[in-house]
């Protein structure tokens, strides 16, 4: 078993329901996001369309959770051993062991980690492993997305919804050239 995401960029409308649901589920501090929604310019603002006025303007949104990489550089650089990869592919932060040094934040090519100034430990998408471990097969971002842009499941199971979507639409890994082998397909 290997958990991962299929995110349909044609369905994402940039509403950030996934971000809000995640904040509420994990009781995150203000300004901490475990999943960011970026526009075409790679920013979290809503005022940067791409194209030419009047008929060619468009917005494309990219939800960016932790990529739960097969080769996670965050695990390699963590001096406390607080970041580790589970057998099911989920990259996890042990908040009790995290020393808040920020080395993993700097190493992540996806910008998927933040240090919470309140706690101060690293925050990142946990793929809602607390839900998955208890038999709830949906993450909060998947459950609440109004356009069903996010699908989570077992990438090793060809019959899973996530694997079927990737097979049907040929999902691409973002920043594949980083060599981390992300488990999120767009």
Residues of each region from the PLM?
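Non-ligating segments of multi-cofactor redox enzymes
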Residues: 1-186
